[in-house]
A protein has these predicted regions:
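A residue-level signal for beta-strand positions that form part of recognition/binding surfaces
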Residues: 1, 87, 129, 218, ...
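Solvent-exposed, flexible loop/coil residues
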Residues: 15, 131, 237
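Short, solvent-exposed secondary-structure boundary/capping segments
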Residues: 1-6, 226-241
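Charged- and aromatic-enriched interaction segments used to assemble
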Residues: 3-122
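Acidic, small/polar-enriched beta strand-loop surface segments
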Residues: 69, 73, 79, 92-231, ...
Length: 242
């Protein structure tokens, strides 16, 4: 068998050294992430940015990749490595809210492409609010409520010292509420073929319509793996849908 890792492995153990660090200057979140990258690397920042006070960003025993993930997670983001370049992409973990699942998807996937499809339910709770706190040094505490809801059924509160502004608090609230939402989980296997014969490689973060007549549905790809045999190349997708 053949296995591999992305270029971002160079920013993680055992290739990159873990260190202890405390930022003594005021920085934006994006600046904190950028300064962790060695020369030759770039950062595609697609999440909210905000100001972080001095001595708020501190850590012990983290590699560059781990420390950047720490910053991105504060605002409900997800970090992934580019397939070809020395680039990290910071994007919202949930590009669409599961309680507002009305959007134009990135692509359509005909059911005829699927070799196998399985489905299971993920239990969850449709909470309508969550308290997001910035830690004892920042004094930020915000009750974020879903639009049009009373906020009478909140999820367990979350605390993150890097949440020092309202915008990351709101973004983190979306991620926390969405992670606990009642969902359906689909596993789909299909041949890896370039269009128009197939769908091409479908990456995590892609939104799609699974076209199957009255049984079709709309989902978000959260995992992709590729397997190779002597005769076939197959991609296996993990997809979630409210």
């Amino acid at each position: 068998s053949i296995s591999g890792r992305s270029l971002a492995a160079r920013l993680a153990d055992p290739y990159a050294r873990a260190r202890d660090y405390s930022e003594t200057q005021i920085r934006t979140a994006q600046q904190l992430a950028l300064q962790e990258l060695p020369a030759g690397w770039t950062l595609d920042w697609q999440i909210t940015d905000w100001t972080v006070p001095a001595r708020t960003f501190r850590y012990t025993g983290l590699t560059p990749l781990e420390s950047i993930k720490r910053v991105v997670k504060a605002a409900g983001g997800w970090l992934y490595a580019d397939r070809f370049a020395q680039t990290l992409h910071a994007v919202p973990k949930w590009p669409q809210k599961p309680w507002a699942w009305d959007f134009v998807p990135d692509m359509s996937l005909p059911s005829s492409y699927a070799l196998k499809e399985t489905r299971q339910a993920q239990l969850g709770t449709a909470y309508d609010a969550i308290m997001v706190c910035g830690g004892i040094n920042n004094g930020l505490a915000v009750l974020v409520t879903r639009a049009g809801q009373p906020g009478s059924d909140p999820a367990a509160s979350v605390t993150d010292s890097l949440i020092t502004d309202l915008e990351p608090a709101k973004a983190r609230a979306v991620q926390e509420l969405a992670d606990g939402w009642p969902l359906r989980q689909y596993s789909i296997s299909l041949p890896l073929q370039a269009p128009p014969a197939g769908a091409g490689l479908i990456m995590p973060g892609t939104t799609l319509d699974f076209v199957d007549g009255a049984d079709g549905w709309r989902g978000l790809v959260v995992g992709t793996s590729v397997s190779v045999s002597s005769t076939d190349v197959t991609q296996d997708l993990e997809i979630i849908s409210p």
